[in-house]
Curated annotation (Swiss-Prot):
It is an enzyme of class 2 (transferase). Pfam families: tRNA_m1G_MT. Keywords: Cytoplasm, Methyltransferase, S-adenosyl-L-methionine, Transferase, tRNA processing. It is found in: Cytoplasm. The keyword Disulfide bond does not apply. The keyword Magnesium does not apply. This is tRNA (guanine-N(1)-)-methyltransferase. GO terms for cellular component: cytosol. Specifically methylates guanosine-37 in various tRNAs. CDD domains: TrmD-like. GO terms for molecular function: tRNA (guanine(37)-N1)-methyltransferase activity.
Length: 255
């Protein structure tokens, strides 16, 4: 996958290119990241990249000419088929379904805004889609862009050490992930669930699915509203609810 970055602070993306899963992907040639700074497309002595908004008001906007020139340079480098994305609070909220959708693109150009944003006409003429990582304000689009890159790169074949990892992540099937345990078997009196030590892969799969369903019901019940549960999933969720109610009753009786 090839990803182009438009940012006033391209050095921030060393967190993606130099470390962790994405860093290994870059090193192994599975992910290619290039960046363009609008500041490199300025022609004045101060390398100005901001401008006052029409109509007044606080704050500045990114200057149109350097931004457009940077986008055009990225498009030229990408060639045909690159999707241009603007990271914006007004965009579609990124979720696992959206990540999976974006991962089908071989080329992405991510435009990171600064100041109060960018000229609406640049959005209309240069941007294919707007995406947001949540209903809150950040200082720029770099962190959302890094979030998008990290999540999308997990779908690139060969990036993860275990090919099943991406499909077993939280939200991969619309559910939260199940609890995980490693050594020691007993930690401050808390034991690993016996089923995970049993070696019975069918029962382990069933336990993990039940816990995934139950955790989603407890923490993000709205996610279940969008799912058509299979007969097995519905049965396991009912079992979890019964067990949870029994545990709560026992806890209340001890209080």
């Amino acid at each position: 996958m090839w990803i182009g970055i438009i940012s006033l602070f391209p050095e921030m993306f060393r967190a993606i290119t130099d470390y962790g899963v994405t860093g290994r992907a870059v090193k192994n040639g599975l992910l290619s990241i290039q960046s363009w700074s609008p500041r490199d497309f300025t022609y004045d002595r101060h390398r100005t990249v901001d401008d006052r908004p029409y109509g007044g008001g606080p704050g500045m906007l990114m200057m149109v000419q350097p931004l457009r020139d940077a986008i055009h340079a990225a498009k030229a480098a990408a060639g045909e088929g690159a999707k241009v994305i603007y990271l914006s609070p007004q965009g579609r909220k990124l979720d696992q379904a959206g990540v999976s959708e974006l991962a089908t693109n071989q080329k992405l150009i991510l435009v990171c805004g600064r100041y109060e944003g960018i000229d609406e006409r640049v959005i209309q003429t240069e941007i294919d889609e707007e995406w947001s990582i949540g209903d809150y304000v950040l200082s720029g689009g770099e962190l959302p862009a890094m979030t998008l890159i990290d999540s999308v790169s997990r779908f690139i074949p060969g990036v993860l050490g275990h090919e099943a990892s991406a499909t077993e992540d939280s939200f991969a099937e619309g559910l939260l992930d199940c609890p995980h345990y490693t050594r020691p078997e007993v930690l401050e009196g808390m034991e690993v669930p016996p089923v995970l030590l049993s070696g019975n892969h069918a029962e382990i799969r069933r336990w993990r699915l039940k816990q995934s369903l139950g955790r989603t019901w407890l923490r993000r019940p709205e996610l279940l509203e969008n799912l058509a549960l299979t007969e097995e999933q519905a049965r396991l969720l009912a079992e979890f609810k019964t067990e949870h109610a029994q545990q709560q009753h026992k806890h209340d009786g001890m209080a």
